[in-house]
From Swiss-Prot:
This is Peptidyl-tRNA hydrolase. GO terms for molecular function: peptidyl-tRNA hydrolase activity; tRNA binding. It is an enzyme of class 3 (hydrolase). One of its GO terms (biological process) is protein quality control for misfolded or incompletely synthesized proteins. Keywords: Cytoplasm, Hydrolase, RNA-binding, tRNA-binding. GO terms for cellular component: cytoplasm. CDD domains: PTH. The active site is at 21 (proton acceptor). It comes from Salmonella typhimurium (strain LT2 / SGSC1412 / ATCC 700720). It comes from the Bacteria.
């Protein structure tokens, strides 16, 4: 099944742009830049959108302008309008359980406490079977510190690692369309930024 919608999760507004929780949006921003497809606000989809072609496939990019816990509103609206099935969607999000410098593809699964994923699963009719790009941001080591951590900005050393992992993820996304998910996954999952 080809991917038809790539989503980068974020909170809206300048005050959140550089926070760890917006790592998914950084990836979609990079894809849009690499493929010269600037994102434009599209109110009916509650987000910034663009359209790209990868290996002859028509793909939509989306960064919701809703708050993170309402991400499903944007994803649901676009999926419904273009008749996109859950397994044709790739959602990029920040991942506490992976260190900075690592990113991994995954199909399906739970939300792991991630409010953006939780809302998307709900708005897709409780169907969790969409693809994810998990962008590692690390963990503060104490679950009571998670909210402050994801809404905080990473230090320069960590930002560099996250950026390198996102860059590799963008290359692997293009590889996915060229040579398939298995090859893209194999390459991405052996990558670790230094």
């Amino acid at each position: 099944m080809a991917i038809k919608l790539i989503v980068g999760l974020a909170n809206p507004g300048a005050e959140y742009a550089a926070t760890r929780h917006n790592a998914g949006a950084w990836y979609v921003d990079l894809l849009a830049e690499r493929l010269r497809a600037p994102l434009r606000e599209e109110p009916k989809f509650f987000g910034y959108t663009s359209r790209i072609t990868l290996e002859g496939e028509d793909v939509r990019l989306l960064v919701p302008t809703t708050f993170m816990n309402l991400s499903g509103k944007a994803v649901g609206a676009m999926a419904s309008f273009y008749r996109i099935q859950p397994d044709e969607i790739l959602v990029a999000h920040d991942e506490l359980d992976l260190p900075p410098g690592v990113a991994k593809f995954k199909l399906g699964g739970g939300h792991g406490g991630h409010n953006g994923l939780k809302d998307i699963i709900s708005k897709l009719g409780n169907n969790p079977n969409f693809h994810r790009l998990r962008v590692g941001i690390g963990h503060p080591g104490d679950k009571n510190k998670v909210v402050g951590f994801v809404l905080g900005k990473p230090p320069v050393s960590e930002q560099k690692l996250i950026d390198e992992a996102i860059d590799e993820a963008a290359r692997c996304t293009e590889l996915w369309f060229k040579e398939g998910l298995a090859k893209a996954t194999s390459r991405l999952h052996t990558f670790k930024a230094q």
